Amino acid sequence: MAYTKADLKHDLAAMGLTGNETILIHSSMKSIGTVEGGADTVLDALMEFFAEGLLLLPTHTWRFINEENRMFDVRRSPCCVGILPELFRQRPGVVRSLHPTHSMAAYGKDAAAYIAVSYTHLTLPT
């Protein structure tokens, strides 16, 4: 049995979420299971559910931005953390931060204001 958009939104509400929160989601389509319509349905559900809040997904590029490839293009550089963030960053109304290796994408309430300062956070080597 495949999940539907309605199932996903119901499950979010069942977790006690209201949709007006600020939420950072680290995602995995494999962990979600089979969804009618695939990744686009998951993103539709998240964006509709959190329409009054702020939805954040990491759009990290650390796998691609390195000594050999130092160029980061906020509009074109693909992310390396899954299909959901990659599709999310390309959707209308989603804004992406300027951090060259650990960017974030945001949608919803005050998304542009949140993203405007997020790239200034330090990322230190481990």
Which residues make up each language-model segment?
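General beta-strand structural signal in soluble alpha/beta enzymes
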Residues: L56-L57, R96-T101, A116
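Conserved small/polar residues in nucleotide/adenosyl-binding loops
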Residues: T120-T126
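N-terminal active-site beta-alpha-beta segment that forms phosphate/nucleotide-binding
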Residues: G16-N69
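Glycine-centered helix-coil hinge/cap
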Residues: G38, F50, G82, A105-A116
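Flexible, glycine/proline-enriched loop segments at strand-loop-helix junctions
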Residues: I32, R70-R76, A113-Y119
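Ligand-binding beta-strand-loop-alpha-helix segment within the catalytic cores
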Residues: N69-G108
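Short amphipathic alpha-helix with an adjacent loop that forms part of the alpha/beta core around
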Residues: L12-A14
